[in-house]
Structure formats: structure tokens, C-alpha cells
């Protein structure tokens, strides 16, 4: 009775899980063997009109339950305990028990086959040559070929690792947090892009922001909405003629028409109309979600999940077929699976129904109609599907199943009939009449049965590959005789198998023990008997094979690609040799080759240049011959009566150059003395004319010249004879200026005679021997040319040029004399004694100090220059003083290095606020003051203390810890960065400007050296004492002080058509506008004038101004904060804002003050009434008085003007000019 309970226990969860795993395995293997388009997950149901063996029993179950009118109870024959038999209400589940038990037995058989193949493979590996056979068996068992490990792998995009599965790769990518900056706040998942993170967040929030305008559908992504919108598109060219549905392509329409054709065939075959909507290419169930297109590792892992020893479709025997040979039908005998526990040696059963009938008929009391099952008429007619294990009771069900499941296996729908005929001729099914069906007699206890084939009661066994004959087996038809005494049956507690004897039971347990000792891989399910093999196999799952290319040398570097290794070898381990084409010597580097060329193949030849004629020589012998033959003074005339040619050559103390004569030495020394220095920049010049031209071209004006000074500041007088140079030096010492030489004294010896005076007969010449007076020269026409020729040096052309220049300057001085018929008067008129200021008391005691040594007792700047040349070996006349921080340097290289490192003097200088480019740091520093937001407040931004002057600014700068700090530092008023001492002084002067100091916006400074004047109460003079002494301007300063008593200096006033940025006066307003445009593009004129609105480029500022008017007034970006005016350029705005500052301070024109002319007449003489031509040149000044009358410019004492008056003969003077000038002179 215990055996019955174990056999008839109900379906357990363990058995159901096992069946589900086996079913999943079958679906996977079917997907792998058949096409990927075949839906293996389709399971027919009763609603589809498909009949299955399960559905037959389920339909017949209610009938069997309804016919159970007289249930009886019985005892088992031979059972001592007398337990009740199971009730017949469990009979409808018999087929389910058989189904589960059948698949469980198949799983056990597959597991046994797997163990057998593993043993054979192990034995073949040891013997050698058996591995191939085992692998082929395994391939046949699983239906899959073992592929290489590299196939189907996934490589990380951030590193070199590869993974066999996509899930492993996705999990690994999350470890690269440095490459995935965006994190989901819900699940902490990392993403590379923000859009991916936002798209992922919509899965958590269920946001559907993209809604269809035609229906109520909503989507979380825009591309999904676009795909959905195509369903509403009515403009599709391909329309279905049956359902009027549109398609974009002909292929889609053709696929759709195949569906209509298929549905029509199903309806014609009598199928269920409800099944017409089924698509043969639909997605499978969850158990078959493993795609057949996946990699080998995926399918093997899914197979391992289904069962520890999952079967393959290749293990299941094919469906048995009946072979009609010669009219006789042979059928293969099925393998018995069930045995009776009471008579196991007598008979075996292939189904639970036969075993149940056997138990009820032989081993228990008869039960009237206990297991009688109603037989339907069509139950005996079974049709099997060739491509799967399903059976059907009619042809329509088989056809519907074939069309729905195996549509792509057939060439055309018409082949169904051929397929049916082929199955009929092959004997796959055999229709049977209802009379041939087995009938169970009411008396189940009698051993006698009807003489019918025992195989007819058995179901179709698909696990048997052998064909069974249709004729009944005589041995199987023998009635079962109950044994006299049932032997003992041994049941296995692991698999519930019943064993007839103990020996079988022990062998069966050994198989379980051997199976338990197997080490099963948790990744792929492979069983391994030994621990070492198991470990090696598990390590192989985590092993990712890669390749790298190592450098075989001692560097030990590795590379992922062979190209990188080759590049490394070429760059690191290949020695490039340079071969000298002259001597074939090899060098390893370019530097070594250069050194070799310099040492071995370079020959230095000294060039000897003659300083007199500039001829080159390559040997000392040639040079000495040249000097002896061409520049020796032995054969030349003497310079004077008592002088003779020097016996030794003269050598320059600065550059060690050798000169053959004293005159040549003086010419050479003049090249070292560039005493004319520009007051605005460090440039120096030999000749004053070059300085004047430099001032006009670079600084917009002309250097102040003293018209009434007879001193001609040219150093070329040193080129004259030594007595003349000595006389010039003595004259210069009287003026306390070593750089200015008096030509009158220097050329005094050029005109012979000891007595005589200037002629009075309108420029008549006197005799050459008459000496001039003490205070006058002879007329240039009375020059003793013979004496001049007698003193001529070996350079007559140069002496002639010097004499001609002197004569021209003396002629100009004569033409400006009070009377035209007198000789040249004294060019030094007596200065007014009342207005001439006395020399400063410390002028004679002023000392200069050298910045390179500790010497401070130098009495003049010329002595300072000489000291630097002699003591510090400075061979250039260029100043080595920094123009920004006033630092002195020993060499030009040190000064340039200082400018590059501290003041950034190279390249363009760009303002970091407005991106404007300037040519120098000084201009940039002045420009940055325009961006100062605090302006001329004069208050400290840290503590708010007012700063009165520059000294207070510097003193207060130290209070905030900036005194000892090195540049750059921040301004205490505007917080701008100051990069140099010049910029610091500029900010100090800018922020300490006071509007209460007499209306002046600037403190008085020298017009030449820009240094503040020590005392502003002396007068409106714009020159300091040092500049007056240096440039011999003492007389001019006295003349400036005279009109100061009659008219005070007015403040800066507004002048029409004058640029307020550079004080330049333009002829009309259009020129002023063009001039302001040039200010805007200062430093970049070579690139043209471009429009910042449309990028148009013009070559002239006038074209740009005309073009800017096309953009309209609304395009002007710069507006004034004091008035509603707007401008196109920043320079226009700055000019306009400075005009606001100057207009309220304009005063009415003062009374005209008659200022004596620069070239005034001598005392006691009347003004010249003769017509003259007056040329006026305006210089850059800080104050210009506004003109009351536009046609009459007023002369202000602060203005520096140079008037050159030229005398014109009466016969060449144009008519009308004389009268006009006379009227203007009389009005003045």
C-alpha cells in the first residue's frame, strides 16, 4: 500500500519545476535547430480549435466524473493492513502524472548520457585521440557547436577588458566613475551623457511629456512619438485592397497580403475565426525569452538554469513511423518505463493507464465501471505533427497548427495536401474504428481479457527510435498471471525509483553517490570529478584573454597595438646618425654636428676696416700698406705755420679706433657724442635737425627752438681745427652747457684781418685783410677763402660743407637784422634785466651720481656720461636707463631683459577690459585710467582717507602693506594692477587731481621732462631750470615771465575743432571726426578700418564714417552719461566727455596784450613796416585760450609759438601782400 501511495501521490512543486525547466530547454533547442522566425512558444488551446492529448483528457474528465455513480472500496489482495484504495475521482489526473513522470525519466536519461560522455572524454584525453569523438557527441547532444572563446565577447570602451556577456559589461562600466559624471538620483546609476541620465529618470518618474495630437497616446521620448505619428499618416502610397490599410513600402504591403492569404486558407480549412489574428512571428513566452541569436555562452547558461542536466532535442528519439513493407506492418516495441510492484518480472507497462488497469484487474477486487472512460468517436483517429510532438484528432486541427506554428517550413500552402498524403503513406497515423477500441469489462477481477492487441491501449511513445509493427506482439498479448507471492521492492529515496532486488538497488545508489561527488560548475553546469579540474574550469570562466606587444629591450614597455610598438622602437631604439659631407664623420645629435662644424670646418678671418675710407682688409700687412700709402701725413701740407704732421697715430679712448689725424679723431669723437636727446623718449641724435624732425614725426610737434640765439648747437664744429675746438669749448663753458657750442666763437678765426667793421653801403664787401670789430663778424662775402684753404684738412669736401652751412646760417641771421644795409650785428641781444630771473643758487653746486657705482661727485651730465664710458666701458651713446622705473643698467642686454620681464615691452599691448591694442606699455597705462570707476576721487578704497597729492598717495600706499612689496601691486584707489613705477606715478597723479586748485586739473609740470615744477608761484613757465640750462633757454624763460605780470594764466578752455585727447586742432569738423576714428584704430591702421557691426573694411577713416551712417543712429553703442548724445566709437565719447569738462571753465577773451616778437629789433628802433610773410607753427600745449573772434587767434603766454620772418625783395614781392601785412602789423 505504501508503494501505491508513492506512485499515486499528486503533482508536487518539485516535479512541476522540473517539467518547466525541461520545456524551456526544448524550446531553446527548437529555436536553435529551426529558423529564428519560428515561434516555438505557441501553445494551442481549446479556444483556437486545436485538440491536444491533454485537451482530450480534460474534456473527458467531467464525463468520467459524472458517470461515477457507484464508487466502491476494496482491499488489495495480499495486503494485511487493509488500507483503502484511492478514490476514482483522481482519475482525470492520470495523464498529467504520466506527462510529468515521462519527462522526469527523460531528464534522468539525459543526465546519465552527460556523465557517460564526460567519462569517455576523460578517458580519451588520457589515451589521446578520443577528445574529438566526445566533443562531437556533446555537440550532438546539445545541438550546439562549441565556438571559440573570442566569439560574442564585449569590450569595454574605457579599458581593454572584454566580457562574454553584455550584462557583465554593463556592470563593469559602472566602475568607471571618472568617465560617467552623471548619476541617477533614484537608483545611483552612472551615465556618460546628461541626456542618457534624463531619459533614464523618466523610467522612475513615468513622465510622458510627448503627447500625440491625434489621439490620447503619450510617450517619454520624442523618437517614439515620431514612430507613433506614422500610424496617423494617411499619405501612404501602398493601400491594401481588403482592409484599406496604408503602407510606405511595397514590401510591407506584400507581407500584409500574406497574412490575408493565410487567414483565408485557415477559414477554408474550417479553422476557428478567433485564431486569425495570431501572428506566426510573434514574440515567445517568458520561458523562451532566450533568443537563439545570442552567443554560445548565453544559451549554455540559460540551459544550465533550466536543469542541472538539461536535455537537448537531439536526445529525444524521433517520432516512430509505421513502415508498410509487403503488406505487413512492423512497429518498434516501446521501452517499458513502469513495472508492477507485485509482479515486476512478469510484465512492464509504458503508461499509467495500463498500470492502473493491471492493478485493478489483477491485484484488487473488481470495481464496476471504475475506470471506464467514455470513448468518443473521433478519439481513435490521431494525426501527429511532423515538426513537433503534438497530435490532433482531425485534419483541420493539424492544418491550423501547421499554418500557425510551422508556416515557414513549407514552400506554399498547397503543399499541405502533399504533406498530408506523405504522412498517410508513411504510416504516421492509423485510423481506427470505434469497434477496435478497448473495452473494460465490469468484472475487472477476472484474469480473462478479450483477444486484442495490447499495443492499442498504449499511447504513442515518442522516446523510442525503433519502429514497432502494427501486428500485435504475441508475448504482449498473453494474459498477465498474478504471482504467487509478491517479492520485495526497493524504492530509492532520491528519485523514487522502484528496484526489484537489493543488487539493483545498490547499483542504483552508487549512481546517485557518484553524481553527488561530481563538482558542478555554477556558471555552465558542467560536472567535473576532480578538484583541480574544477578549479581550472572555474578560473577559465573569469579569464579574459588579450594580447599585448612588449618591447624586448630593457625599457619593459608594453603596447596594445603592434603599430604603437613599431613607433616606439623607431623613436626610442633607433639611433639616427648625422654624417658630415666634408669629412664623413658621424655625429649622434644635431648639436654634436653643429659643434663639429664649428670646430673642424669653421675658420674665423678678422676683417680690418679703415676708419677714414671704410675700406676692408683681411690681413695686417695690407692694412698697414694702405695707411702708409693713402693716409700718411708726411707729404701733406701742414695745418699751420708752426704745426707739423703727428708722428704717432691717435687712438679713440672709447672704441680703441686709430685715426691718422686730429681732425679725423674729432670726426670720430663726434660719432660717440649724441648729445641731442628727445625729451619725450630715450632717443638721442648727433644733429639738432634730426631731433627736430623726430619731434615732428613722432611726437606731433617740433622741439622748442630759440630763434634769437646765435648759438648753433651742432657738434660738427669739433671737426674743425684744434684751436677752433678749444675756442668752442671755452665758449660753451661760459654758458655752463657742454653740449652747446657757439659757432661765432668757433668760426672767428676763419675770417682774416685784425680791424675793420661792418660795411654801411647795403652789404658792400670790405677788404679781406680788415679785421672785424670786437662784437661783429664780417659779411659772409668777405670771408678769406685763402686762409680757409690754407687750413683745409685732408677732407676738403667735408670742410666745404661745414663752411657752407655756417655761411647759410649767418646769412639767415643777417636777413633778420633790424636794418638791411648794415652788417651782421651781435646775435646775442641784451636780455631785459628786470625780467631775467637770477640763476638758481644751487646751479653751480649741483652734482650728479652714477647709478652703477658709488661715485656722486660728478658736476655735470656730460661728466657723468664720460665717467660711464671710461669707468664702465659703455661703448654706445644710447641711454641705459629704463623709461618706466628709472632703473640704470650696465648693458643694453640687461636693459632689454628688464623690459621683457618687468614691463612686457615686446609685441602688442592689449587692454584686458576692452581688448584694445596699443603700441607701448605707457600708452596702455594711460588708457587704463579711462576704465577707472572711482575717477579722480582721491580717496583710498580701503579706509576712505582723502589723498591730497602724490606724496600723500605714496605715503598712504605703505600703510596698507604695499610699500616694500614688489611690482605688480594694486592701486589703493581703483584696485587696478600697476606693473611699473611709471604706471604707479601715473595713477598717483590721476587720483590726486583736485578741482579746487584754481580750476586746474593738472599740477604744473615741465613741458620737456614731464617732471613737476618745484614752485608754481614763479610764473606760468612750463620749463624747469634743468631743461632751461640744458637747452640754453634762459632768455626765453625771462620773456615768459614778463607778460605774466599783466595777464594771469587762464585755465584750460574749450576750442572748437580741437581734439581733446591729443590737443591737435583740425581745420573743420569732418577732419576732427576722421581724426577721432584714427584714435580708435591707433596701432592697427595697417590692417584697415573695419566696421564692428558688419565687418566691412575701409582704407580711410572717411569711408568708415560714411558707412557707419548707413547703420542708423540706433546702432551707436556709446552714450554720454551727461547728455543724450550717442557715438559710434569710444574715442568720440572720450572727446565729448572732456569737452563737458572744458566748456564750463571757458572765459571771455582777454584783452589783447602786445608781446614783443621773438626776433625783435634793437632798442630805439621802430618796428619794421615792410611787408613780411609770417609762418605760424602750433605746438602741443596744455592750455589754449578760446578765441573770441574766429579769424583772430590770441597769443597766450603759456603757448609756445615759433614765428619765422623772411625778408623778401621789393621787386619780387606780390602786390597786395605788403598792404595786408602792414595793416595786420599796425593793428597788432
Swiss-Prot record:
GO terms for cellular component: nucleus. It holds the Pfam family zf-C2H2. Belongs to the krueppel C2H2-type zinc-finger protein family. GO terms for molecular function: DNA binding; zinc ion binding. In embryos, it is expressed in posterior spiracles and peripheral nervous system. The lineage of its organism: Eukaryota, Metazoa, Ecdysozoa, Arthropoda, Hexapoda. This is Zinc finger protein 423 homolog. Residues 88-105 have a biased composition (Basic residues). Residues 829-842 have a biased composition (Pro residues). A zinc finger (C2H2-type) spans 154-176, 182-204, 210-232, 238-260, 383-406, 490-512, 519-541, 549-573, 578-601, 608-631, 676-699, 880-903, 909-931, 938-960, 969-991, 1057-1079, 1089-1111, 1118-1140. Residues 1179-1204 have a biased composition (Acidic residues). Residues 438-455 have a biased composition (Basic and acidic residues). Residues 30-105, 306-331, 438-483, 758-778, 817-848, 1138-1228 are annotated as: Disordered. Residues 34-47 have a biased composition (Low complexity). InterPro entries: Znf_C2H2_sf, Znf_C2H2_type. Keywords: Activator, Developmental protein, DNA-binding, Metal-binding, Nucleus, Repeat, Repressor, Transcription, Transcription regulation, Zinc, Zinc-finger. It comes from the Eukaryota.
Amino acid at each position: 500500500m505504501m508503494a501505491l501511495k508513492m506512485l499515486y501521490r499528486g503533482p508536487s512543486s518539485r516535479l512541476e519545476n522540473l517539467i518547466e525547466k525541461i520545456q524551456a530547454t526544448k524550446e531553446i533547442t527548437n529555436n536553435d535547430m529551426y529558423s529564428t522566425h519560428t515561434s516555438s512558444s505557441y501553445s494551442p488551446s481549446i479556444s483556437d480549435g486545436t485538440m491536444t492529448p491533454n485537451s482530450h483528457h480534460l474534456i473527458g474528465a467531467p464525463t468520467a466524473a459524472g458517470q461515477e455513480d457507484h464508487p466502491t472500496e476494496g482491499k488489495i489482495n495480499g495486503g494485511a493492513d487493509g488500507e483503502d484504495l484511492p478514490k476514482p475521482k483522481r482519475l482525470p489526473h492520470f495523464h498529467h502524472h504520466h506527462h510529468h513522470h515521462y519527462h522526469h525519466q527523460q531528464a534522468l536519461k539525459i543526465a546519465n548520457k552527460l556523465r557517460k560522455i564526460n567519462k569517455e572524454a576523460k578517458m580519451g584525453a588520457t589515451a589521446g585521440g578520443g577528445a574529438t569523438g566526445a566533443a562531437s557527441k556533446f555537440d550532438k547532444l546539445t545541438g550546439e557547436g562549441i565556438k571559440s572563446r573570442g566569439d560574442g565577447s564585449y569590450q569595454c570602451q574605457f579599458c581593454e577588458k572584454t566580457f562574454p556577456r553584455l550584462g557583465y559589461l554593463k556592470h563593469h562600466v559602472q566602475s568607471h566613475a571618472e568617465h560617467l559624471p552623471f548619476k541617477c538620483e533614484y537608483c545611483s546609476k552612472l551615465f556618460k551623457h546628461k541626456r542618457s541620465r534624463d531619459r533614464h529618470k523618466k523610467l522612475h518618474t513615468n513622465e510622458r511629456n510627448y503627447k500625440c495630437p491625434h489621439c490620447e497616446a503619450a510617450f517619454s521620448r520624442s523618437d517614439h512619438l515620431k514612430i507613433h505619428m506614422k500610424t496617423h499618416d494617411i499619405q501612404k502610397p501602398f493601400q491594401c485592397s481588403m482592409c484599406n490599410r496604408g503602407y510606405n513600402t511595397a514590401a510591407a504591403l506584400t507581407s500584409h497580403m500574406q497574412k490575408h492569404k493565410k487567414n483565408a486558407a485557415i477559414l477554408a480549412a474550417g479553422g476557428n475565426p478567433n485564431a486569425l489574428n495570431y501572428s506566426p512571428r510573434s514574440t515567445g513566452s517568458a520561458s523562451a525569452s532566450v533568443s537563439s541569436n545570442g552567443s554560445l555562452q548565453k544559451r549554455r547558461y540559460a540551459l544550465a538554469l533550466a536543469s542541472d542536466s538539461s536535455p537537448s532535442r537531439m536526445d529525444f528519439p524521433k517520432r516512430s513511423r509505421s513502415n508498410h513493407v509487403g503488406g505487413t506492418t512492423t512497429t518498434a516495441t516501446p521501452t517499458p518505463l513502469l513495472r508492477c510492484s507485485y509482479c515486476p518480472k512478469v510484465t512492464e507497462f509504458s503508461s499509467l493507464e495500463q498500470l492502473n488497469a493491471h492493478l485493478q484487474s489483477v491485484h484488487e477486487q473488481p470495481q464496476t465501471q471504475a475506470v471506464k472512460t467514455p470513448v468518443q468517436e473521433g478519439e481513435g483517429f490521431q494525426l501527429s505533427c511532423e515538426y513537433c510532438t503534438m497530435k490532433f484528432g482531425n485534419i483541420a486541427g493539424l492544418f491550423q497548427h501547421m499554418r500557425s506554428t510551422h508556416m515557414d517550413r513549407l514552400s506554399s500552402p498547397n503543399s499541405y495536401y502533399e504533406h498530408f498524403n506523405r504522412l498517410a503513406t508513411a504510416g504516421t497515423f492509423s485510423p481506427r474504428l470505434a469497434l477496435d477500441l478497448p473495452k473494460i469489462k465490469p468484472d475487472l477481477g477476472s484474469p480473462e481479457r478479450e483477444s486484442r492487441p495490447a499495443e492499442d491501449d498504449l499511447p504513442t511513445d515518442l522516446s523510442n527510435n525503433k519502429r514497432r509493427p502494427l501486428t500485435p506482439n504475441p508475448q504482449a498479448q498473453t494474459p498477465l498471471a498474478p504471482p504467487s507471492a509478491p517479492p520485495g521492492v526497493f524504492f530509492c529515496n532520491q528519485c523514487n525509483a522502484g528496484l526489484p532486488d537489493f543488487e539493483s538497488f545498490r547499483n542504483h545508489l552508487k549512481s546517485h553517490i557518484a553524481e553527488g561527488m561530481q563538482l558542478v560548475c555554477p556558471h555552465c553546469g558542467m560536472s567535473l570529478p576532480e578538484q583541480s579540474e574544477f578549479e581550472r574550469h572555474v578560473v577559465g570562466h573569469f579569464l579574459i584573454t588579450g594580447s599585448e606587444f612588449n618591447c624586448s629591450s630593457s625599457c619593459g614597455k608594453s603596447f596594445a597595438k603592434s603599430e604603437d610598438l613599431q613607433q616606439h622602437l623607431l623613436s626610442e631604439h633607433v639611433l639616427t646618425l648625422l654624417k658630415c659631407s666634408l669629412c664623413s664623420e658621424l655625429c649622434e645629435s644635431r648639436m654634436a654636428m653643429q659643434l663639429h662644424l664649428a670646430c673642424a670646418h669653421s675658420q674665423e678671418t678678422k676683417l680690418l676696416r679703415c676708419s677714414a675710407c671704410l675700406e676692408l682688409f683681411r690681413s695686417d700687412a695690407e692694412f698697414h700698406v694702405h695707411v702708409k700709402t693713402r693716409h700718411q701725413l708726411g707729404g701733406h701740407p701742414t695745418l699751420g705755420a708752426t704745426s707739423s704732421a703727428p708722428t704717432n697715430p691717435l687712438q679713440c679712448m672709447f672704441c680703441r679706433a686709430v685715426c691718422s689725424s686730429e681732425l679725423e679723431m674729432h670726426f670720430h669723437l663726434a660719432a660717440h657724442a649724441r648729445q641731442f636727446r628727445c625729451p619725450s623718449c630715450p632717443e638721442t641724435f648727433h644733429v639738432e635737425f634730426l631731433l627736430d624732425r623726430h619731434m615732428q614725426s613722432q611726437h606731433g610737434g617740433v622741439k622748442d627752438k630759440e630763434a634769437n640765439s646765435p648759438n648753433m648747437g651742432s657738434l660738427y664744429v669739433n671737426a674743425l681745427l684744434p684751436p677752433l675746438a678749444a675756442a668752442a669749448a671755452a665758449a660753451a663753458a661760459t654758458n655752463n652747457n657742454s653740449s652747446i657750442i657757439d659757432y661765432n666763437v668757433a668760426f672767428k678765426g676763419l675770417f682774416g684781418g685784425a680791424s675793420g667793421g661792418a660795411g654801411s653801403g647795403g652789404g658792400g664787401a670790405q677788404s679781406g685783410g680788415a679785421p672785424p670789430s670786437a662784437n661783429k663778424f664780417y659779411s659772409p662775402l668777405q670771408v678769406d677763402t685763402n686762409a680757409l684753404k690754407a687750413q683745409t684738412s685732408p677732407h676738403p669736401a667735408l670742410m666745404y660743407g661745414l663752411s657752407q652751412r655756417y655761411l647759410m646760417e649767418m646769412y639767415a641771421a643777417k636777413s633778420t637784422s633790424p636794418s638791411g644795409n648794415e652788417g651782421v650785428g651781435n646775435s646775442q641781444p641784451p636780455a631785459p634785466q628786470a625780467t631775467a630771473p637770477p640763476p638758481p643758487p644751487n646751479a653751480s653746486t649741483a652734482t650728479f651720481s652714477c647709478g652703477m657705482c658709488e661715485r656722486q661727485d660728478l658736476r655735470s651730465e656730460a661728466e657723468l656720461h664720460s665717467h660711464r664710458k671710461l669707468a664702465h666701458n659703455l661703448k654706445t651713446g644710447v641711454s641705459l636707463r629704463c623709461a618706466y622705473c628709472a632703473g640704470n643698467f650696465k648693458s643694453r642686454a640687461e636693459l632689454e631683459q628688464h623690459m621683457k620681464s618687468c614691463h612686457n615691452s615686446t609685441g602688442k599691448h592689449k587692454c584686458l577690459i576692452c581688448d584694445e591694442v596699443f603700441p607701448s606699455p605707457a600708452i596702455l597705462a594711460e588708457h587704463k585710467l579711462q576704465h577707472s570707476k572711482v575717477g579722480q576721487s582721491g580717496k583710498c578704497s580701503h579706509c576712505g582717507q582723502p589723498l591730497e597729492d602724490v606724496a600723500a598717495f605714496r605715503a598712504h600706499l605703505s600703510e596698507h602693506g604695499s610699500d616694500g612689496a614688489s611690482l605688480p601691486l594694486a592701486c589703493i584707489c581703483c584696485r587696478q594692477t600697476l606693473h611699473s613705477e611709471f604706471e604707479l606715478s601715473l595713477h598717483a597723479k590721476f587720483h590726486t587731481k583736485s578741482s579746487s586748485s584754481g580750476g586746474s586739473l593738472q599740477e604744473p609740470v615741465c613741458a620737456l621732462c614731464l617732471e613737476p615744477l618745484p614752485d608754481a608761484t614763479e610764473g606760468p613757465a612750463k620749463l624747469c631750470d634743468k631743461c632751461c640750462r640744458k637747452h640754453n633757454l634762459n632768455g626765453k624763460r625771462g620773456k615768459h615771465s614778463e607778460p605774466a605780470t599783466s595777464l594771469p594764466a587762464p585755465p584750460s578752455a574749450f576750442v572748437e575743432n580741437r581734439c581733446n585727447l591729443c590737443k591737435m586742432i583740425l581745420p573743420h569738423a569732418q577732419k576732427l571726426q576722421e581724426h577721432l576714428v584714427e584714435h580708435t584704430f591707433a596701432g592697427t591702421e595697417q590692417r584697415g578700418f573695419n566696421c564692428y557691426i558688419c565687418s566691412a573694411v575701409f582704407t580711410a577713416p572717411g569711408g568708415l564714417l560714411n558707412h557707419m551712417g548707413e547703420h542708423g543712429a540706433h546702432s551707436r553703442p556709446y552714450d554720454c552719461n551727461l547728455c543724450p548724445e550717442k557715438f559710434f566709437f569710444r574715442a568720440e565719447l572720450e572727446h565729448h566727455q572732456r569737452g563737458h569738462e572744458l566748456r564750463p571753465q571757458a572765459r571771455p577773451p582777454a584783452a589783447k596784450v602786445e608781446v614783443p616778437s621773438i626776433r625783435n629789433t634793437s632798442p630805439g628802433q621802430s618796428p619794421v613796416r615792410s611787408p613780411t610773410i609770417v609762418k605760424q607753427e602750433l605746438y602741443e600745449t596744455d592750455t589754449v585760450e578760446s578765441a573770441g573772434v574766429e579769424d583772430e587767434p590770441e597769443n597766450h603766454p603759456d603757448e609756445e609759438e615759433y614765428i619765422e620772418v623772411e625778408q623778401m625783395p621789393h621787386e619780387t614781392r606780390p602786390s597786395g601782400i605788403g598792404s595786408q601785412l602792414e595793416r595786420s602789423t599796425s593793428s597788432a
